Regions:
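N-terminal intrinsically disordered, low-complexity, charge/repeat-rich segments that act as generic
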Residues: 1-39
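Compositionally biased, intrinsically disordered low-complexity regions enriched in proline and serine
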Residues: 4-7, 11, 38, 56, ...
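Short linear sequence elements within intrinsically disordered, low-complexity coil regions
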Residues: 8-11, 15, 42, 60, ...
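General "foldedness" signal
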Residues: 17-19, 83, 110
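Short, conserved turn/kink motifs that form compact alpha/beta structural patches or helix kinks used as
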Residues: 36-95
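Short, compact, well-ordered microdomains
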Residues: 85-115
Length: 115
C-alpha cells in the first residue's frame, strides 16, 4: 500500500524569524506536539495544523502498515520512498495518510487516528 507522509516544514524566512524571536504558529504547534507525552492533545493540534495548511507532502512510502512506514521513513530502504520534497526522518507530529484517506499522526507512543 502507498502512504503519503506530511510534515510541518519551515521556510528559510520562517527560520530567520524564529531565530530573531518572532512568534511562529508552526513552532508552537510542533513544540506542543513534542511535549504531549500522553497524546491527549495530539489530534487537536493536528486539526489546527491542517486547518492552517501547515503540513506539506514530503514523500510517498510503499509499506504494509504504519509501523513499516515509520521504519522505512527513518532507515530505508530508499527504494520504497518517492520523495516529493525535502524530508526529515519521520517523527512525532508527522501525518501519514493511506490510499483510502485514513490519517494517523505519529505520537510519542505509536500512532493516533485523525478524522
Amino acid at each position: 500500500m502507498k502512504y503519503t507522509v506530511y510534515q510541518i516544514r519551515y521556510t528559510e524566512a520562517e527560520i530567520d524569524g524564529i531565530s530573531a524571536g518572532s512568534k511562529s504558529l508552526k513552532r508552537d504547534i510542533r513544540d506542543d506536539m513534542a511535549m504531549d507525552f500522553r497524546g491527549e492533545k495530539m489530534v487537536g493540534l493536528v486539526e489546527i495544523a491542517l486547518n492552517e495548511n501547515l503540513y506539506t507532502g514530503v514523500a510517498e512510502i510503499e509499506a504494509t502498515c504504519l509501523d513499516e512506514v515509520f521504519q522505512v521513513g527513518n532507515i530505508g530502504p530508499e527504494s520504497q520512498i518517492t520523495r516529493l520534497g525535502r524530508m526529515a526522518s519521520i517523527s512525532v507530529g508527522d501525518l501519514i495518510e493511506d490510499e483510502d484517506g485514513n490519517r494517523h499522526v505519529v505520537a510519542n507512543f505509536g500512532f493516533k487516528e485523525v478524522a
